[in-house]
Amino acid sequence: MANSLAIIADPKTGKTYKREIPSERMSSLIGRKIGEEVDGVFFDLVGYKMKITGGSSVDGFAMRPDLQTQGKKQILVKYTSGYRGKNGIRKRITARGSIIGSDITQINLKITQYGPTPIEEKKDDQQA
C-alpha cells in the first residue's frame, strides 16, 4: 500500500491543506465511513477532530456516501455527482462505496474541532 493523501478543509478560513498519510497510519483508517469523526493524530494535528467527507480510489472513482460498501459498484443515476444527465436520461456509472479500503489514495476531511496550535504553523505543510 502506497502513501495516501489527506485533503483537510478549514471552514473558518476557507483554505485547504494537503497532508501525506504514511501506510502504517492509513491501515488504522481502513473500515471508517464517510461522516465519521477521526482524531487529528493520524495527520500530525494533535487536539483536532475531523469529519470524513469523501475521497477517491487509485482508479479515480469518487466515494459516494449512499453506497454502503468498500469496493466499486455500478449504479444507475440521473443527475448526481459523477454524471450530469438531462431531461430524465439515466446512465450507469461506476462509483466507490463509503467505506475506506486499502485502495483509497485520497481522503477529504473537514475540521470540526480545533486544536491548540493553528495548522498554518506546521512547517512541513503544503497549501492546496
From Swiss-Prot:
Name of a matching Pfam family: Ribosomal_S6e
UniProt record, GO biological process: translation
InterPro entries according to UniProt: Ribosomal_eS6, Ribosomal_eS6_arc
GO molecular function per UniProt: structural constituent of ribosome
Keywords: Ribonucleoprotein, Ribosomal protein
Gene Ontology cellular component terms for the protein in this record: ribonucleoprotein complex; ribosome
PANTHER family registered for this protein in UniProt: 40S RIBOSOMAL PROTEIN S6
Family, per entry: Belongs to the eukaryotic ribosomal protein eS6 family.
Name the UniProt record assigns to this protein: Small ribosomal subunit protein eS6
Originating species: Thermoplasma volcanium (strain ATCC 51530 / DSM 4299 / JCM 9571 / NBRC 15438 / GSS1)
